[in-house]
Every structure is written in structure tokens, then in C-alpha cells.
């Protein structure tokens, strides 16, 4: 699968990363239309790739503001109707911190999204102050181990222990586990030995445009694994 990344081509400051403008979008209320724009754009590309025979899923990060919005699940349902992409091929990622900011609302929203068939992932797992009493109620399919634990796990024993424990916890809960921030073959091999389900990071690829991704999928050994049989 792939994850949607949004950048802002600012007329004065050039290409801005999300951490430069997402907080502003949240403060001004622009995060809602921005999220819907990203969802439509991501699903449009996913639809095209799937029609070309590439069995891809699409992940989109959502804000705490989205997860607290009672209208959000309905909006997602309407957007899904616009594209020939199975709901299970859309994965919405939310951080632990976002869930715990309004846990009751978050649980209710996630239940409605799950009822649509959309998959939910907890992003940056291990960096927030989550309550297991709420996490066990969330109908999540996946947890993503934050890159701060993964990138140096080959050299840092504590990081390695945290990653191993998180993989075991996720699997014991029946969840898939993804490691973020994989930059070397050594780390990839260690994750594989732990039975980690998936990984993402510069070892696989740097961020790509939609056109660049299409070419990468056709040429890279990683991309060829997504081709439909």
C-alpha cells in the first residue's frame, strides 16, 4: 500500500512540509476541506492504479478535528461513493494523542468509520499517553510503530526491546503491525525476524509524486510485489 503525503507549494516560501501548515489549517478550520481534498485526490489515484492492475491500498492521515466531527463518517461515506475503490482499501491513520484528546468522541467516530468497511490505524504508536481502556475499544486494524523507536533499533537496545514488545502486543491483540522509519537493510532484516507485518521508510523509497510512484511500481522489486496476479 501507499500513504498520501500533502505538500503546500507556497508562492513565496516554496514547497512546505505538513508540519509547517497543518497546525495553521487546524487553527483556521481549513483542515476539514483540506482533508476531503486529500481523500478525493488519494482515492482518484488509487482507483487508477487498481484499474491498471496494481493491487494497492491507500492510507490517509486524519486530524483530531476530523475524528471529533460527528459529520466526518458520513462525509467519508459520500466520498467513497465517488470512486471504484473498495472501502477496505482505504486506511485512515490517527495518532494516539488525537484519540485521547476526546476519547469518547473518537471511539464513536471510529466505530462508524469501521462500519463503512474502512480500516483504521493508530499512527506514531508509543509516543502518546494512551489509555489501554480506550484503545481496546477502538476497532483498529493496525498499529504503526513510531520511527523514533525503529530507525536506530539495530544500535539501541532499548529501542529494539520496545519494537519487539510492540510487535508482540499488536499480534496478541489480533492487529497488524507496521514499522515506520526503516532506512537500512539491517533494520529491515531485524523487523522481518520479529515478524513485523509491514514497514515503510527511505529503505523502500523516498516520497514520490503520483507519476513517479507509477514508474517506481513498475521497476522496483518492492513495487512489483503489489502487482495483481
Task: Annotate each language-model stretch with its function.
Residues 14, 50-56, 84:
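Catalytic core regions of nucleotide second-messenger enzymes
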Residues 109:
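Conserved functional hotspot residues or short segments at active or partner-binding sites
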Residues 3-13, 22, 39, 46, ...:
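EAL-family c-di-GMP phosphodiesterase catalytic domain
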Residues 29-30:
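Catalytic-site/binding-pocket detector for metal-dependent nucleotidyl cyclases
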